[in-house]
A protein has these predicted regions:
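AMP-binding/adenylate-forming catalytic core of the ANL superfamily
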Residues: 140, 147, 234, 257, ...
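Conserved AMP-binding A3 loop
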Residues: 55-82
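Conserved pre-ATP/AMP-binding loop-to-beta segment of ANL
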Residues: 5, 9-14, 19-59, 66, ...
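Conserved AMP-binding/adenylation subdomain of ANL enzymes
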Residues: 78-98, 106-146, 160
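ATP-dependent adenylate-forming carboxylate-activation enzymes
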Residues: 1-3, 122-142, 151, 314-320, ...
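Adenylate-forming AMP-binding core of the ANL superfamily, especially NRPS adenylation
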Residues: 180, 213, 220-266, 274
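Conserved AMP-binding
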Residues: 102-107, 179
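Gly/Ser/Thr-rich phosphate-binding loop
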Residues: 119, 144-149, 158-220, 233
């Protein structure tokens, strides 16, 4: 993207080693991005190659375990870009779209949506850091039509003190991905802006989007992460037997596609566990527990590694987090299981309060949960934090908090 800078900025940047330099081959197969943008052609659709050479190795976020290299081929990438743009077409054509990208380009979401938009002739506005005033200013300046960000970004927008000073009415399509969107955030956003936040779901291993709420439906079911996108096939199975479950029953999500990733880089054990053969077809085990209704809407329940085992019950940490985040004093929450030799795991919540809130105690939040959750789902411990550990794209790093608790207990 440094090629888009004015010539004098590129020159100074390279002289000061701020702008990266690199060598590349110069033949008929190499296209300079700056010249491609300058052509201003529209309606050009290259055929997707039947196979696909490796074009990049993208690393997972490492929210549950250490990051893993995912080899992505060109056919998968182009297919994902195509369907990502088609998913917004009921509201916007790619050519007229001005897209605010609130996720980085080293993330699969930023690549397939951001670069997919450029390949379709749209306009992409990048924000390396979540500076809300800069984002709002760009929305006004460029009359942005769409924006995507993690759920934490939408909570920050709602809490921003100067939000009423900006006109964000040009945005027709607000999208959230990367984590579960709390119901109270979606409701507050709809009440304030009169717009729906459309949820989407995908992984690095699937090359991006797997499902998305249809943008021509202003009232998607609460907590829905959408319907399966073209080019993808899904199965919801029992995590133990791998037998398909009925609609309405929660199970592990499996994903398959024509040009799918089939292995991790130099990780044979992880590859064997994640990529499996069923009925002669390769499937990726997402490790995410979802359910599906009779209309094909998918609902995120939890990650298998984040399910808390307490007194024989399997408890969704996401459900407890969502309940805590509905409290008017809470801006963020992360729930983990703490090992206990008697009950298996006890429920501990790490909570961040809003800046101007005082006088809220752990007992207040436990009482709040007791009024809204069944007794065995109520946290036993509440710990207040100034912030929660997050990845560079805003995902909660529950692994870090679990490791903290293990070290704390080993030290006692």
């Amino acid at each position: 993207m440094a090629d888009l800078l004015p010539w004098w900025k590129r020159a100074f940047g390279r002289a000061l080693s701020i702008v990266p330099k690199g060598d590349f081959a110069t033949d008929e197969k190499v296209r300079l991005f700056r010249k491609m943008v300058g052509r201003e052609k529209s309606g050009v659709h290259e055929e997707i190659p039947p196979g696909g050479d490796l074009i990049e190795i993208l690393y997972t976020g490492g929210t549950t375990k250490s990051p893993k290299g995912v080899p992505i081929n060109g056919a998968l990438f182009l297919t994902q870009c195509k369907y990502a743009m088609e998913s917004m077409r009921p509201l916007l054509t790619p050519e007229e779209n001005v897209f605010m990208c609130g996720v980085p380009l080293f993330h699969i979401l930023g690549q397939t949506l951001g670069l997919g938009l450029i390949l379709s002739g749209g306009t992409l506005v990048l924000h390396p850091r979540p500076n809300l005033d800069a984002i709002f200013t760009c929305i006004e300046r460029f009359h942005a039509k769409a924006m995507i960000g993690v759920p934490a970004l939408y909570r920050m927008i709602l809490e921003h003190r100067r939000i009423d000073q900006y006109n964000l009415g040009s945005v027709k399509c607000w999208m959230a991905a990367g984590d579960a969107l709390p119901v109270e955030v979606e409701k507050r956003f709809r009440d304030k802006f009169g717009r729906t936040i459309f949820q989407a779901y995908g992984t690095t291993e699937t090359g991006g989007g797997v499902c998305m709420c249809p943008v021509d439906d202003e009232n998607p079911p609460p907590k829905s992460i959408g319907r399966c996108l073209p080019g993808k096939e899904i199965r919801i199975v029992d995590p133990i037997t791998l037998e398909s479950v009925q609609d309405g029953v929660a199970g592990e999500l499996l994903v398959s596609s024509k040009f799918m990733v089939t292995s991790y880089l130099n990780k044979p054990e992880e590859t064997q566990n994640a990529f499996i053969d069923l009925n002669g077809r390769k499937w990726y085990r997402t490790g995410d527990i979802v359910s599906r209704d009779e209309r094909g809407n998918l609902f995120f329940v939890d990650r298998t590694v984040d399910t808390i085992k307490h007194k024989g019950y399997r408890i969704s940490s996401s459900e407890v987090e969502s309940t805590l985040q509905e409290h008017p004093a809470v801006i963020g929450a992360c729930v983990v299981g703490v090992p206990d030799r008697i009950v298996g795991e006890r429920i501990k919540a790490f909570v961040v309060l809003k800046e101007d809130v005082k006088g809220i105690t752990g007992y207040d939040l436990i009482r709040w949960c007791r009024e809204r959750l069944t007794p065995y789902k109520v946290p036993q411990y509440i710990e207040f934090r100034d912030m929660l550990p997050k990845s560079k794209v805003g995902k909660l790093l529950k692994r870090d908090l679990r490791d903290e608790e293990l070290k704390r207990r080993e030290a006692t």
